[in-house]
C-alpha cells in the first residue's frame, strides 16, 4: 500500500563506485558517468501481480486465449497496451513459477516505460502509485468493468512494485571508448566482463552478452 522507493544513491562499495575508481586510473577503462549520471533517463518500473482468486482470470483468458493454469505457455511473450499513457506491458510465464506457489494463484509481471506520466485510470504517475493502484491501472486496460476495478485490486490480487533507477543505463547514448574493451590494449592479467564491456557486433540487455564477454 505504499509506492516503491525511488532511491538513486550510488553507494560506496557498489558496482558503479568500483567502476568509477577503476576508470579514474586510465581513460581506456571507460566512462561510467555516461551511464549512471541521469536516473530520470535510465529508470524503469515493474510490479508483480499475484491473483488470489478466479475473478481476474477470465480477463486474462480473453486476451491470451489460453488457460494460465495448464502448465503451458500463457501469453507467449509480452502483451503491450499500445494506448496506455504509461506504455504498459505485461506477461505471464508458465505457471506455477515457484514451488510453493498455490496452484490456483497466477503471477503476472507488469511494467511500464513511462514512469513519469499520469495513468489513464489512476491519474497519477506510476512512480507515485502503490501496488494496488498499479494493479487498478492494469485491470482497467485488460477490460475489467470500472465499478469492479478497485475491489478486485484490493481483494483479488496482491501487487508488489519495484523501481529500478539505473536498469536502462546500458541503453544511454555513448561514444566508442565509453565502455572498456573486454581486454584493454596492453592488459595482461585482467579483463572487463558484463553489460558495460565493449563487444563488437553484439547487443546488450541479454544474459548471453554478459556470458560472451
Predicted regions and their residues:
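C-terminal segments that line or cap access tunnels to active or ligand-binding sites in enzymes
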Residues: 1-212
Amino acid at each position: 500500500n505504499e509506492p516503491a522507493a525511488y532511491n538513486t544513491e550510488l553507494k560506496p562499495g557498489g558496482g558503479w563506485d568500483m567502476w568509477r575508481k577503476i576508470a579514474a586510473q586510465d581513460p581506456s577503462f571507460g566512462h561510467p558517468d555516461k551511464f549512471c549520471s541521469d536516473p530520470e533517463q535510465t529508470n524503469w518500473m515493474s510490479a508483480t501481480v499475484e491473483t488470489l482468486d478466479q475473478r481476474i482470470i477470465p480477463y486474462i483468458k480473453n486476451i491470451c486465449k489460453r488457460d494460465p493454469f495448464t502448465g503451458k505457455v500463457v501469453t507467449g511473450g509480452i502483451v503491450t497496451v499500445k494506448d496506455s499513457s504509461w506504455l504498459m506491458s505485461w506477461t505471464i510465464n508458465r505457471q506455477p513459477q515457484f514451488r510453493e506457489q498455490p496452484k490456483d494463484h497466477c503471477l503476472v509481471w507488469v511494467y511500464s516505460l513511462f514512469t513519469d506520466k499520469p495513468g489513464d485510470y489512476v491519474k497519477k504517475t506510476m512512480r507515485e502509485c502503490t501496488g494496488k493502484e498499479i494493479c487498478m491501472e492494469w485491470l482497467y486496460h485488460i477490460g475489467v468493468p470500472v465499478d469492479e476495478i478497485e475491489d478486485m485490486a484490493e481483494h483479488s490480487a496482491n501487487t508488489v512494485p519495484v523501481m529500478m533507477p539505473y536498469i536502462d543505463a546500458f541503453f544511454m547514448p555513448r561514444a566508442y571508448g565509453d565502455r572498456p574493451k573486454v581486454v584493454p590494449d596492453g592488459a595482461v592479467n585482467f579483463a572487463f566482463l558484463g553489460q558495460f564491456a565493449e563487444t563488437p557486433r553484439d547487443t546488450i540487455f541479454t544474459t548471453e552478452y554478459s556470458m560472451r564477454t
